[in-house]
Amino acid sequence: MNETEATLPVFTLEQVAEHHSPDDCWMAIHGKVYDLTPYVPNHPGPAGMMLVWCGQESTEAWETKSYGEPHSSLAARLLQRYLIGTLEEIT
């Protein structure tokens, strides 16, 4: 975790789960929480592909795009724009 991330709010998976619609879409990916609501209408793939992961731990979807292909480095840079916090570690 870098210095900037250390100052971000920490969310539980239950809090992420409250944001599960096209108008309120949060995802947890690799221990970080992203509010992807503004990006939903701009997603280049089918909207439904992204929406099924709203409100969830979505690392698997990020890594495979649901069909075995990783996201591009451009997508990884774009994702950082939507970072809002970190996911609480479960011990």
UniProtKB/Swiss-Prot annotation:
What are the entry keywords? Disulfide bond, Electron transport, Heme, Iron, Metal-binding, Transport
What is a single Pfam family found in this protein's UniProt entry?
Cyt-b5
Any single GO molecular-function term of the entry would be: heme binding
Q: Quote the record's binding site residues for heme.
A: 43, 71
Which residue range or ranges hold the Cytochrome b5 heme-binding domain? Answer: 8-88
Annotated disulfide bonds:
25-54
**Cellular component per GO?**
intracellular membrane-bounded organelle; membrane
The reply to whether Heme figures as a keyword in the UniProt entry is yes
Q: Which PROSITE patterns match?
A: CYTOCHROME_B5_2
Per the similarity annotation, which family is this? Belongs to the cytochrome b5 family.
Full protein name = Soluble cytochrome b558
The source organism is Ectothiorhodospira shaposhnikovii (Ectothiorhodospira vacuolata)
Taxonomic path: Bacteria, Pseudomonadati, Pseudomonadota, Gammaproteobacteria, Chromatiales
